[in-house]
Amino acid sequence: MEGPRLPDCVSDRIFTMNRRYWRVAAIAAATISMPAMAQDMDHNGMDHGQMDGMSMDHGQMNHDMTPAPSPGEETEHHEVNDSSPFATGSGTARVPGAEGSMHGLHIMSGDWMLMAHGYAWGVYTDQGGARGDDKAYVQSMLMATAERPLGDGARLTLKSMFSLEPLMSARGYPNLFATGETANGIGLIDRQHPHDLFMELAARIDVDIAPGATAFLYGGPVGEPALGPSAFMMRRSSRYNAEAPITHHWFDSTHITYGVVTAGVSASRFQIEASAFRGREPDEERWGIETPKLDSWSVRGTWTPSPNWAAQVSYGRIKSPEALHDDEDEGRLTASIGYGDDRLSVTGAFSAKNRLPGPVLTAWLLEANWNPTGGHNLFGRVENVENDELFPEGEPLHGQAFRVTKMQAGYAYRIPLGKLFGLALGGSGALYDKPRALDAAYGKSPFGWTAFAKLSLGD
């Protein structure tokens, strides 16, 4: 089944606009590369209406900033603005507007507001059981964005995101029951793959169409389509969890996509959007930009009834996402609800991954981060997933689906380092529930633990 075909005149115009976005995104990457390595972006509180000459509201979207500084002045932001029903997650996704603040670098330069966030995360993990392994590694991310008015109720946002995780082994790091993508032509099992150098190079234009409502167009050579909740690196509910979810390829594996165009309508309490994008996941060559194409599609509706809540439902038809299953497409249905305030962030999500042809594999996720006082943080994640990729070809259990549950809990203590930086020290442990048929491969009761030090520009 293919997505609906656009008339040739409309299609030509979209492709022309998409090429322009790629040029703009490339210029943005060179212009706004500054010290920032971003994960926990949530941008609640920046009232674009406070910026000189700007009537930017992105549908009353706030970015959690102090009032704009004087040109050339650097600042941090730390106020929570509960008046905005939503904040920005990854791509065009929304998260609760009152999830709490984060710090970051902000500079005014003429009409431009430049923003930077990021982290370098030193991690050691020891995944137990017969198929476990241990590894010391560094995760990293850098994000820089730039915004300015274009006049006549239009605004431009340039977005870039980078990672040095390609320096990691192609096999990534140990993560029991995680699957997806390849290393040296072999499917990754019980491993989490590294991210690409280029995680986002995109631009977004918002145009006022009614009081409190905008139409927007987002796209670029690297971006994220309108599918699933905000990616796990951008959810405050997982801000100190150093392990990727084992359900990553059910919910947010499209967060690095080579070729994306998204159009939508955004208002204070809802957003409706549709995307065309490349379905194939990134290959093993993590340093370059793969050839963009638009062979897949998705739609997403998001509801933000108050600053504390954000809910989304989305569906995508993905063309041949996995290199080792070249003849399989995927129909992915996701639904999620997020809650946030200045102390607590929670995400609950469901996904049904329909292999075409093949079975429907479902997954559930519940994760939270609680900041009871000061720098103390308690976090946890529970995942339940039906996975048929736990055994490679040639093994008797290859292709058989097993439902497994991962239960993880951890603690982190954040130490402020001046106004802009912070250091979080912590760790987590994980237990698993699985069918007895997996005892021979994984052991009866595998246990994993992780320790980390996370240096952040912003938080």
Locations of the language-model features?
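Repeated loop/turn-to-beta-strand initiation elements of outer-membrane beta-barrel proteins
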Residues: L114, D152-L156, P211-A215, R269-E273, ...
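Surface-exposed coil loops of outer-membrane beta-barrel proteins
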Residues: S169-T302
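Residue-level signature of outer-membrane beta-barrel architecture
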Residues: S109, A146-P149, V207, G264-A267, ...
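Outer-membrane beta-barrel translocator/channel fold
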Residues: P166-L197, Y315-L324, S345-L365, G375-K406
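Outer-membrane beta-barrel "beta-signal"
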Residues: A409, G443-D459
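Transmembrane beta-strands of outer-membrane beta-barrel pores
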Residues: A120-G128, F162-M168, P221-P225, A267-R269, ...
